[in-house]
Every structure is written in C-alpha cells, then in structure tokens.
Design a protein with these regions (language model features):
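Surface-exposed helix/loop patches within compact recognition domains
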Residues: 28, 45-104, 179-197, 209-211
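C-terminal or internal capping secondary-structure element at the end of a domain, subdomain, or sheet
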Residues: 186-237
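Bacterial Sec-dependent N-terminal signal peptides
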Residues: 7, 11-40
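Short, surface-exposed loop motifs enriched in S/T, G, D/E and P with embedded aromatic residues
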Residues: 38-49, 135-137, 178
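Conserved, function-critical positions that sit in or immediately flank catalytic
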Residues: 103-182
Length: 237
C-alpha cells in the first residue's frame, strides 16, 4: 500500500512539473544561459510596420524587434538595427543591459555578394579584407568558376557585421558580407500573424553583448529555444 501511495505521489509530482513547463497562452519563454525563463507579462506593438515584443519578469525585461510582421526569419546582430534583441535587469539599483549590437568578434554568418570568376572547389581558403584576421573558408564553385557556396572553417576574430571579405584564389573577385559575429547574433522567426485577432507567434534565439559596460555582468547573455505564442498586439503608444 505504501509503495502504491508513493507511486501516486511521484506520478502527481511529475504531472505538476509537466504542467509547470507547459506553454502559456499567450506567453513567452526560453532558456536563458541554460536555465528556464518565462515572462510574467508579454505584449507586442507595431509601429510603422515594425514589430516590438516586450516581455517582463521580476526585475527583468526582454525586448524583441523585427523590421516587419511578415512571416520568416530575421537575423540579429547585423547592420539592420530594426532586427534586434535586448535584455535588461535591474536589482538594488544596479542596471545590467545586453543587446545584439554590432561588435567585433569571430564570424558567425556570411552572405555571398559576388560569385567571382576562376574559382574551383577548395578547402581552407584564406581571405582578405574586413576588420579582423584569421578567417578561412571552404568553397564550392560552378562550371563557370563562380563561387556558389561558402562554409566557414576558421572564424577568425575582430570582424564586424557588414565587413566585405574577399576570397583568395581564382581571379580574386569573389566576395561575401559578414552578417553577424558569434558574440552578437541570432534570429527571430515569425511563424504566425493573425491580423484579425491581432496576435503573433514565433521563435527566437540569440547571443547579446554587455551594452552598458557594467563590470559586474558577464560579457554575453544567451537565449535558446525561445518561443512566443499568441502575443496580443496593442496599439502603439
């Protein structure tokens, strides 16, 4: 009988834990530095077509922004300041702020801007240009000698979002743009926008750097597996 009661107690505890992590409707939650984080209140605003989501927990504010409400993915930490994430906490009058702002670092994501000519498939290809050094890539080229795919091999350091980098070899004319760097990157994905009920849903993940240079805070805050669901869009204020 005691074993049976213990089994019931364990089952009830497991159900309670499962219920605790079930997604709120509406709600916003994710993993902050590998620990579960959930907003106590969340709301969204649209101003001039740009989306802002504000999520509040005790002493904490998480803000997500995208350049539109269109479905799709929005890269963070790039030169497009309309796509951003920020996190702030204030406790005992000590303010700590993080943001996905352009900052020097190892390259995270690139976008090919010029395929160039004279290239062939190659590995460990050096690069030139940009703010940093040490960046090398693997490349694939088409029959005309144009680069069609760039894969990061060594991410280097000291690069900035927006840097234009040249791939060596070929006719030295294939280039790509640094979209963002590892310590300030991520994406927001809008998966659903209901313009009748005025609600929005999606996912997010990002690294954000210490933006107010507070020596008491870590250099980077990380959010992973983030989701927002049926967040109400309120009139802009």
């Amino acid at each position: 009988m005691r074993k049976f009661l213990s089994l019931i107690a364990i089952t009830f505890l497991m159900m309670s834990c499962s219920e605790d992590v079930k997604f709120n409707d509406p709600g916003l939650q994710g993993l902050k530095n590998d620990s579960f984080w959930r907003a106590a209140d969340v709301r969204a605003y649209v101003t001039d077509g740009k989306l802002t989501i504000e999520a509040y927990a005790q002493y904490e504010v998480l803000t997500l922004g995208t350049s539109s409400t269109n479905l799709g993915k929005y890269k963070l930490g790039s030169t497009n300041s309309s796509n951003f994430a920020s996190y702030a906490t204030t406790f005992d009058d000590v303010a700590i702020e993080y943001a996905t702002i352009p900052t020097p670092g190892p390259v995270s994501t690139v976008s090919l801007t010029n395929v160039g000519t004279g290239y062939t498939d190659a590995t460990s290809v050096a690069t030139t240009g940009g703010s940093g050094s040490g960046l090398s890539v693997n490349i694939k080229a088409n029959a005309n000698g144009g680069v069609t795919e760039v894969t990061l091999l060594s991410r280097g350091n000291g690069y900035m979002a927006g840097d234009i980098v040249t791939i060596t070899g070929g006719n030295l004319n294939s280039k790509f743009r640094v979209v963002n760097v590892q310590n300030s990157n991520g994406e927001i994905e809008i998966t659903q926008f209901d313009n009748v009920k005025m609600t929005i849903s999606g996912k997010f993940k990002f690294n954000a750097v210490n933006s107010n240079n507070n020596p008491l805070s870590a250099d980077v805050v990380n959010f992973q597996s983030g989701e927002f669901y049926n967040v109400q869009i309120y009139p802009s204020i």
